[in-house]
Amino acid sequence: MKFLDEAKVYIRSGDGGAGAVSFRREKFIEFGGPDGGDGGRGGDVWVEAVNGLNTLIDFRFQQHFKATVGTHGMGRNRTGANGEHVTLKVPVGTQIFEEDAETLIVDMVTEGQRFRLAAGGNGGFGNAHFKSATNQAPDWANPGLEGEEKTIWLRLKLIADAGLVGLPNAGKSTFLAAVTRARPKIANYPFTTLHPNLGVATVDEREFILADIPGLIEGAHEGVGIGDRFLGHVERTRVLLHLVSAQEEDVAKAYTTVAHELEAYDGGLEDKPEIVALSQIDVLDEDELKKKLKALQKACSKKPMMISAITGKGMLEVLRALRDVIVENRSYDDETISQRPKKHRHKLEDRPQHENGPEESEEGEE
């Protein structure tokens, strides 16, 4: 399935039906009086967050969504039928913006969340509503109100527990493929990964979601390369795993380049917990490895972990470190939520070790 994380769509709710001008006509009843019914209400346009979707690709082929109009009122005080609603089904994590692409309307962060984007127009009153002591036979009725129309932007920010960041060819996709059932494209050239990939990792019977985004390069926050476009997908993560390839000539520069881009990106990524790991260590001898590990430790001011997705070395330790941070943050979130006033499979242990080789505003419908 192709990945699309931004879409522009046009929505229009239904017009209300017109009220009817009608008079009661029955045998032997000379002055039956008005009996025009009201028009039906136009349909609404709703958005709903659903599981099982991780792309907005459906909105590439359909950009116009229109609810149906309410039917007109009829004689004998019959009210017209309401128009049918239209619901846009989007992945959990989708944000809805106004046409300016900056004003946030709603953030769809939980499964089943619904929000009304455009309300249908009310139906018009039939002439029976306008009967009075001074006007026993009104010959007019109200037209239905027009529905709302607008252009909106849908922007998807995937919800994952941990995000993988690093330069191109740092081994992020290889890591994701090794610890989850995800099968991202892997090749020995930069920007093999062109869109984010998600996978579910399991360690010690605990599951968490990993997000792999395209590699970052210097100047990414200014639009250089493609990684900056996808940084929004790791904004919601609880921890970042920063991979630095042992094949880099200068591992310290490789680390600081990405760290600078995270800091320059306006999304609070520099404040997230970070685990640093020297990847692809199977390609170096022991002396060279020690030298690069020391340089990386000096650059990041913490002891980096060492991993090889090919041999499996250090992979379990990294997963456990990620799990510990995620569990700690989840516990903090749960505690924070509990203090608020209430309002209305793929296991690494099973992987063979090779010595060589390769997350409506529920507003009910009215």
UniProtKB/Swiss-Prot annotation:
It comes from the Bacteria. One of its GO terms (cellular component) is cytoplasm. Residues 347-357 have a biased composition (Basic and acidic residues). Its cofactor is Mg(2+). It is found in: Cytoplasm. Residues 160-327 form the OBG-type G domain. One of its GO terms (biological process) is ribosome biogenesis. It holds the Pfam family MMR_HSR1. InterPro entries: G_OBG, GTP-bd, GTP-bd_Obg/CgtA, GTP1-OBG_CS, GTP1_OBG_dom, GTP1_OBG_dom_sf, OBG_GTPase, P-loop_NTPase. An essential GTPase which binds GTP, GDP and possibly (p)ppGpp with moderate affinity, with high nucleotide exchange rates and a fairly low GTP hydrolysis rate. Plays a role in control of the cell cycle, stress response, ribosome biogenesis and in those bacteria that undergo differentiation, in morphogenesis control. This is GTPase Obg. The lineage of its organism: Bacteria, Pseudomonadati, Pseudomonadota, Alphaproteobacteria, Hyphomicrobiales.
